[in-house]
Structures are given as C-alpha cells and as structure tokens.
Amino acid sequence: MPNHDLTAEQVRDLRALAGAIIPPSATYGVPGADDEKIFSDILRSLGRDRDDICRALAHLARLAGGAFADLGPERSAQVAVNFREVGGTPLAALVRVVLLCYYRDDRVMRSLGQEPRPPFPKGHVVEQGDWSLLDPVRARPRMYRSVD
C-alpha cells in the first residue's frame, strides 16, 4: 500500500464508509467503492484532501463510539446518516475522493455505456439540448468588470 498516513483503523473505517457511500450493485454489475482496486485508488488519491479526510474519519469514529468498521449493519447505517448531516467540509472532501476514484474505474464506466478511455483525442459526443434554457443567464447584467 502507498504511504497514505492513515492508521490501520482509519483505513478500515474509510473502506467501510466508501462501501456505504457506493455499495455494489448486482443489477448494474458494478463493484462498490470498497472494491480492492477502487479502494487502492482512493488511498493513492488522498493528496491535498488528506487532512480533511483524517478529520472526517476522526469525527466518524467519535460518532460511532469507536471503529465504524466494527459496527453492525443497522448501527453503521444510523451513524452514516448522522455523519452525512454533520460531516461538513471534511466529509465533502472524503466523498469527492471516493466519487472521483469510483468513476475512474473501467468497470463502472462500461456499466454507464462509456468507453473507458480519456476524453481526448477522440472526444465524447454530447447530446444537444435546449439552448433557450440559457436565455435567463444571457439576459442578466454583467457580473464582471471589463478589462478595456
């Protein structure tokens, strides 16, 4: 495992929480965010969010009264709901990392009907929408100062 500066208990809690945020789906044939490959990517991707994620995990442990990963399904669901309500910015950083890593996984992209590849140089086709929806934005006065 890479140097992620998390304790073994924090890693277990993060993995359990990632699986609660995005559980596996047999219907769509996709893994949960606690899948080995996806979770390894999460640990490698903590980067600038490491401090917020450590704060979030410490808060989660306080709410759980110990290790979140050791809770039963019913209690962990209660703690997760409470954590979602009070987690604030640290939780938002944690969720962002989980989502970014989850949607980088080839299996997930294929389940969404997307070819698992970078958007360039081939690009992706974006369906045309109703451009008139932007009319209220275009009608607004400028919100910036002109440079000339």
Feature map (PLM): residue ranges:
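Mature-region segments of soluble proteins
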Residues: 12-20, 35-45, 50-148
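Immediate post-signal-peptide N-terminus of mature secreted/exported proteins
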Residues: 2-27
